[in-house]
Amino acid sequence: MRERIPGIIRQTAASIESIPVAEKQAYDALAQCIGENGPVEDHTDSTLLGELFRVKLARSCRQGLHWHAISWWLAENYEYFLLDALHASLKRPDQPDDLFWYLKKRGLEGALPLFADCAAPLVDAASQTTALTPALFRLALLRNLWGNKADLSMSGGVVSQKELKSDSANLLLLDDIDAVYEYYCRERVTAVTIMADNTGFEVLCDFLLAALLLHFNAALCITYVVKAAPVFVSDVTLPDVDITLNAMAASSSGCLLSSCSSLALQWIASTLREARQAGRFVPVASSFLCTAEPGWNMPLSLAELLDRQGQQGLLISKGDANYRRLLGDLHWPYDTAPKAVLEYLPCAVLVMRTMKSNVNIGISEEQQTRAAQFDAKWDCSGKVGMIQFYHWRVCNNHNNCRSRTRSPPASPPSCTPSPGPSSG
């Protein structure tokens, strides 16, 4: 809160073309208030998103709390609500509605040629087989996982090309790829919901995975859930979906791409557009994913979507913020069994994230030791990844079935709100 969040606010203001001095000062004032632990003020409105913040903000204001005293999860999400409101009040007619548009545009332009080189071999492999093989499934998930490193909210708006493309300096701590592939094939999954995370390189990886799944499974429908408002700098919103698809489809005009790479991008874009026309690829926006609410408080519309998927469904949760939401942003003991927390979900869940906060479950002491030997800040550095699969009808040994419960998990006494990244 002292450095990273104020830095993001100032970086965002600096990215706005021809920003007047008065506008820049308004952004600076918000950054200074948060960085210097100013009082929390209730600026919620009558919008759905404002209503979702109202109770928590009213409670904080009644208690006279300052920015560094409220939970990090609330502070971080509310900060983006205030940023959006500030942008809306200052926006000129020639400016985009998304205040992070300039940063996102730069990120997409840099990511396209790098992603195309990574995607071309997978698209080529898909053209040479009639079924989604375990090897191709694994490659697609790994590409998708490490694409999560491209998070502008953690980097202050800058992600290096080397970081986007390299997998060699990373550690895959939890690898449930074989388990989810077995479930996907055995249950003949027909419905997948993807909770999206970042634009740029990561959304390109999402689209690659979605295109491959749709290509090999004619009965499959994918719901792609994005944020209803711009948050966390690079998070995907509905306009970003078409912006990205258009950029991929127009890739032949880019002189930096080989014909093979360009064709791969065009195949992904055309596959998703055709699926979208047929109602098999459906992007939807969620205000709930822009709030500090825990997963077990998800609105009925989202809960019913997952409930309808049932035994033939799969929820894919992308990134750190969505994972924190599923766990209520509580600091569970790292070796907590996933079933103790995730039983409220009505369908199977696959988590793919690079670890950027100390909110984790399902990590044994042995795995924690291994991770610490790899990186002293392994749970916050973004260099350690997890592909974690859980289903309420499957125990850890993937044998015995049991009944599920839709009630919130019971927090153990040692379970506390997450203090946020060590970098502050």
Residue ranges of predicted features:
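Non-catalytic accessory regions outside enzyme or core folds
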Residues: 1-191, 388-396, 410, 415, ...
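Short, glycine/acidic-enriched capping/hinge loops at junctions between secondary-structure elements
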Residues: 17, 204-207, 363
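Gly/Ser/Thr-rich loops at beta-strand to alpha-helix junctions
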Residues: 72-74, 195-205, 229-231, 320-325
